[in-house]
């Protein structure tokens, strides 16, 4: 009986200490870069959300479709790696923009242990595509207009 009580006490103590360690991991404050790296376009002033201009490409089968990556430099580290001291500093999102109807599809999200979507990649096991219709006069809609004007081909951008 004493062995059972001792075993349960040790198990409970271990479980409590594991939760405390995990809580400490969630509080990793980061200082994202203040200067915009060459090749990246900041979408909103004072927000760490960027388009990687070197990732932009036009679909050769459907020229109204433009593919690109958005990068978010995080201000709080995310523990998504198996190593307890490694954490994500940035998120890279692969997106597809349909310039004919301004539908934006987020295809994939990956975490990286360095800023600017660089370094060791960690991908969630299950990911779903999400598509939304961009609303006029929003930051994403304005960015989409610029991308479509510069990259999208053979389509009409008139939305009347």
Swiss-Prot record:
Subcellular location, record wording:
Cell outer membrane; Cell surface
User: In the record, which residues are listed under signal peptide?
Assistant: 1-15
- Keywords noted in UniProt: Cell outer membrane, Lipoprotein, Membrane, Palmitate, Signal, Virulence
Q: Name one GO cellular component term.
A: cell surface
Q: Which InterPro entries does the annotation name?
A: Adhesin_E, Adhesin_E-like, Adhesin_E_Pasteurellaceae
Q: Classify the protein's membrane topology as the record does.
A: Lipid-anchor
| Main location as per UniProt | membrane
Q: Where is the lipid attached (S-diacylglycerol cysteine)?
A: 16
Could you tell me which residues belong to the region Interaction with laminin and plasminogen? Answer: 41-68
Q: List the disulfide bonds.
A: none
Q: Please describe what happens when the gene is knocked out.
A: Mutant displays a reduced binding to vitronectin, laminin, plasminogen and epithelial cells, and is more sensitive to killing by human serum compared with the wild type.
Alphabetized Pfam families for the sequence:
Adhesin_E (PF16747)
Q: So what does mutating residue 85 to E actually do?
A: 50% reduction in binding to vitronectin. Does not bind vitronectin
Q: Which Gene3D superfamilies match?
A: Surface-adhesin protein E
Q: Does the keyword Lipoprotein apply?
A: yes
Q: Where is the lipid attached (N-palmitoyl cysteine)?
A: 16
- The UniProt annotation puts the region (Interaction with vitronectin and epithelial cells) at 84-108
Q: What does this protein do?
A: Acts as a multifunctional adhesin involved in direct interactions with host epithelial cells and host proteins, including vitronectin, laminin and plasminogen. In addition, interaction with serum vitronectin plays an important role in bacterial serum resistance, and conversion of plasminogen to plasmin at the cell surface aids in immune evasion and contributes to bacterial virulence. Induces a pro-inflammatory epithelial cell response, leading to interleukin-8 (IL-8) secretion and up-regulation of ICAM1.
Indicate the quaternary assembly: Homodimer. Interacts with host vitronectin, laminin and plasminogen. Can interact with both immobilized and soluble vitronectin.
Its protein name is: Surface-adhesin protein E
- What is the phylogenetic placement of the source species in the record? Bacteria, Pseudomonadati, Pseudomonadota, Gammaproteobacteria, Pasteurellales
